[in-house]
């Protein structure tokens, strides 16, 4: 009775069991990404969440920056015109050294790059661009052996995709991208402009608008400030910036609001199931070396 909510921050192989038990006890649930270790786990968890009617949410914190929230607003308002292209990556180098010992992240397909890093950028793509209808994926294990055991999943992967809107896309994910510490970045092209964002410079975006004299056109940097979503509670001065932990605070606030209002906030389990569906399709595509229609998986 003293437990008011459950936060799941374990390896994803344990997410389903904890979530199912929490919903059975009538507790709201916040689950770290990815939702489950497999599409079956994610589907079962979502069904339980929907049946319970309890507040639920999944932790995709990187999309919470004021900069990325501003990009969502630009796109929703049609500021870039018809969007034609999305390019995203989530690249890090924490396993670039083949002498780094194997850990739980090196075992099981759900813990590889497609299960660990890809969900963050796939979530961004869905949030910014809308549903993905088809994709082609390939993945590879770069370092097959490490101290402590063999590696049983992918070190890097790439996805070509088509969105329901008709836009094309490409995403790349890597945990062996030498020199890249937090390469969560994306660029979006539209008929009236383009925008790009890089998590390593999370307090700004680069925006291009197809307007004005040709001689004065170009990408311009926009520093986030109180005029942008969720910035002012942290600082009243533009350009001073927010940090990584502030993204966590923003999503924690939304989960507390979900509990207070007794309704799920974005991204809910239902929203996050769409990320799991894309990951599942990517795994099938990589195994079959063929395009996969999301409606078929």
Predicted regions span which residues?
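Hydrophobic residues in well-ordered beta-strands that form the structural core
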Residues: 8, 31, 56-58, 87, ...
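C-terminal helix-rich "cap/oligomerization" subdomain common to oxidoreductases
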Residues: 3-8, 212-213, 240, 249-250, ...
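Glycine-rich, aromatic-lined ligand/substrate-binding cores of catalytic
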Residues: 131-134, 148-149, 153-170, 176-194, ...
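Predominantly a Rossmann-like dinucleotide-binding segment in NAD(P)-dependent oxidoreductases
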Residues: 62-151, 158, 205, 289
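C-terminal glycine/acidic-rich active-site capping loop/insertion
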Residues: 61, 144, 158, 162-163, ...
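Beta-loop-alpha module in the N-terminal Rossmann-like domain of NAD(P)-dependent dehydrogenases
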Residues: 1-48, 249
């Amino acid at each position: 009775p003293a437990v008011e909510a459950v936060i799941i921050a374990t390896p994803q192989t344990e997410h389903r069991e904890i979530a199912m038990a929490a919903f059975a006890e009538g507790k709201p649930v916040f689950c770290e990404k990815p939702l489950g270790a497999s599409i079956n786990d994610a589907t079962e968890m979502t069904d339980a969440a929907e049946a319970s009617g309890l507040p639920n949410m999944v932790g995709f914190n990187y999309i919470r920056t004021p900069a990325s929230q501003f990009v969502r607003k630009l796109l929703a308002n049609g500021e870039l015109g018809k969007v034609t292209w999305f390019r995203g990556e989530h690249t890090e180098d924490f396993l670039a050294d083949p002498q780094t010992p194997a850990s739980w992240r090196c075992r099981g397909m759900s813990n590889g790059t497609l299960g660990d890093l890809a969900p963050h950028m796939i979530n961004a793509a869905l949030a910014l661009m809308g549903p993905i209808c088809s994709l082609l994926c390939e993945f590879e294990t770069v370092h097959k052996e490490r101290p402590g055991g063999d590696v049983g999943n992918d070190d890097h992967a790439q996805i070509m995709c088509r969105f329901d809107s008709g836009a094309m896309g490409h995403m790349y994910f890597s945990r062996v991208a030498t020199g890249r510490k937090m390469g969560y970045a994306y660029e979006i092209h539209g008929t009236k402009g383009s925008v790009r964002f890089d998590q390593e410079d999370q307090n700004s975006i680069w925006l291009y608008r197809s307007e004005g004299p040709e001689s004065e056109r170009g990408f311009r940097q926009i520093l986030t400030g109180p005029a942008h979503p969720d910035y002012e509670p942290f600082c009243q001065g533009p350009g001073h910036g927010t940090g990584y932990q502030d993204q966590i605070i923003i999503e924690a606030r939304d989960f507390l609001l979900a509990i207070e209002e007794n309704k799920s906030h974005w991204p809910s389990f239902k929203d996050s199931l769409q990320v799991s569906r894309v990951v599942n399709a990517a795994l099938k595509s990589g195994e079959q070396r063929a395009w996969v229609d999301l409606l078929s998986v």
